[in-house]
Design a protein with these regions (language model features):
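Gly/Ser/Thr-rich loops at beta-strand to alpha-helix junctions
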Residues: 5-9, 37
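Residues that form or flank phosphate/diphosphate-binding pockets in enzymes
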Residues: 9-10, 125, 189
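Alpha-helical scaffold segments in soluble metabolic enzymes
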Residues: 13-17, 70-74, 133, 193, ...
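Basic phosphate/pyrophosphate-binding loop/patch that engages nucleotide-derived ligands
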Residues: 16-25
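C-terminal substrate-binding/catalytic lobe of Rossmann-fold NAD(P)-dependent oxidoreductases
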Residues: 27-30, 37-86, 90-179
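A short, charged, Gly/Pro-tolerant segment at domain boundaries
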Residues: 34-36, 206
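NAD(P)-dependent Rossmann-like dehydrogenase/reductase catalytic/cofactor-binding core
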Residues: 163-165, 170-206
Length: 206
């Protein structure tokens, strides 16, 4: 068992219900993610010290972040499961692998990730149907909290916890679906989900 990285955890969780049901156009996925300075790892570096990061916002590794292949790999698996179940919306044989545009940003907070993903669907779907889809997909998943209405996840509300908060919106003017995910990169994005996986492997309560 391998735990995914912090960015992939957010991206996969926020897009999994759409991908697993074959709703997303795989060539339309854009992800804009923001992480606190602890997301850069344990090694000290000048850009991550408080005087450098304070009152600053910077995009980095644009189009070449190491987590892009991991996100595409897992979304591909979700798409292919749907194909094997009988959908014709996507086939691995056709070479129609999902390709994402991913841009991470460093923000002046110690911990936390806020990921906003944009995608287009094969067919127009009412937002109430999409909310129902997410509720059904994550039914019984105690560490997933779904926001409905106009509220949006905030990393502050998951700090120190193993939760991933998700929200889903539809831009009727453009036809795009927007999902927002918030998690603590040091817990749900790292040690917390490792413990969660261990509990499942050992038969303990999750």
């Amino acid at each position: 068992v391998a735990s995914p990285g912090c960015y992939p955890t957010a991206a996969i969780l926020q897009l999994a219900p759409l991908a697993a049901n074959g709703l997303i156009r795989p060539d339309s996925i854009l992800i804009d993610a923001k992480s606190g300075v602890s997301g850069a790892g344990r090694s000290p570096a000048l850009p991550y010290h408080f005087p450098e990061a304070h009152e600053s916002l910077e995009a980095y590794k644009i189009g070449q972040h190491r987590h892009i292949p991991e996100i595409e790999q897992e979304l591909s698996e979700l798409f292919s499961r749907r194909t094997r179940a009988g959908s014709t919306a996507w086939t691995r044989d056709a070479g129609n692998l999902p390709k994402i545009v991913f841009t991470p940003h460093l923000v002046p907070m110690n911990r936390g990730i806020l990921s906003t993903a944009y995608c287009r669907l094969h067919n127009p779907t009412d937002i109430s149907e999409l909310h129902a889809l997410y509720r059904d997909f994550y039914k019984g998943e105690r560490f997933i909290r779904l926001h409905e209405g106009d509220t949006s996840p905030n990393p502050r509300h998951v700090r120190g916890a193993n939760f991933c908060d998700l929200a889903l919106f539809a831009d009727r003017r453009t036809g795009w679906v927007i999902t927002v995910a918030a998690l603590d990169n040091l817990v749900k994005g790292a040690a917390g989900q490792a413990i969660q996986a261990m509990n499942l492997m050992c038969g303990f309560p999750e």
